[in-house]
Design a protein with these regions (language model features):
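Flexible, glycine-/basic-rich loop-and-beta segments that form/coincide
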Residues: 1-49
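C-terminal target-recognition/interaction regions appended to catalytic cores
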Residues: 48-184
C-alpha cells in the first residue's frame, strides 16, 4: 500500500496504464534473456546468475508446472509440512511462475526456489538476480554490483526485493509533480 498526502490539497494518482486485462507478463519482462542452468552465471551479464539447487530441489522443480506448487510433486518429494491432513502447509512456496501472467510480488529471497513462487516458468531453476530486477521494472542495464566488492545474492536480493518497483515510483513521482503543478 502506498499513501500519498498533502496538506495543500488532495493528490490524485495518474490514471493506471494497466488493468486485469492489460498487464506486463513474466514473458514480457524476462522472456528475452538467455537460458541459464541452476548455479550458472551468464558470461555477458554477471547479474544474470541463478542459485544452485540441491539435488532434491532439482527433482522437485522438474515436477513443478507453471502456476503450480509442491502439490504437483510425487509424495516422496514432499516435505513433512506439506503432508499435513489439515490441508494447510505453506501453499505459496516451491511455486513456478507462469509466462503469460503477471509476476508474483518479488521479495528479498526471490532467488531461492523454496521461498515463494519464484521458479522460472520453463527452466529448472529459481529466478536469476537479473530476472528479479527486471520484474521489479529496473532497466536491463542497471547494475547492483560494486566493482570493488563481490556482492552476494543475498545482498543484491535485499536491494531488489525491498525496492519500490521503478515504474511504481515513477507513477508516484509524476502524481506528486502534477499535484504541485496544479497548485500553481
Amino acid at each position: 500500500m502506498v499513501l500519498l498526502a498533502s496538506r495543500l490539497g488532495n493528490i490524485e494518482l495518474i490514471p493506471p496504464i494497466y488493468d486485469e486485462n492489460n498487464y506486463i507478463t513474466v514473458r514480457d519482462a524476462i522472456g528475452n534473456l538467455p537460458a541459464l542452468e541452476d548455479g550458472a552465471t551468464d558470461p555477458n551479464d554477471q547479474l544474470h546468475r541463478a542459485s544452485r539447487l540441491s539435488e532434491m530441489n532439482r527433482k522437485r522443480i522438474r515436477q513443478s508446472v507453471p502456476g503450480g506448487s509442491w502439490k504437483d510433486w510425487d509424495d516422496d518429494l514432499k516435505l513433512p509440512c506439506h503432508k499435513k491432513t489439515s490441508g494447510k502447509g505453506y501453499r505459496a512456496v516451491y511455486g513456478r511462475m507462469e509466462w503469460d501472467k503477471p509476476s508474483p510480488t518479488i521479495t528479498t529471497q526471490y532467488y531461492g526456489y523454496g521461498n515463494g513462487r519464484f521458479g522460472h516458468p520453463e527452466q529448472n531453476r529459481a529466478l536469476s538476480m537479473r530476472e528479479g530486477a527486471l520484474l521489479q521494472s529496473f532497466p536491463n542495464d542497471y547494475q547492483f554490483l560494486d566493482p570493488e566488492h563481490q556482492e552476494t545474492n543475498r545482498s543484491i536480493g535485499v536491494h531488489i526485493g525491498n525496492a519500490v518497483p521503478v515504474e511504481l515510483g515513477r507513477a508516484i513521482g509524476t502524481s506528486i509533480l502534477n499535484h504541485l503543478h496544479n497548485l500553481g
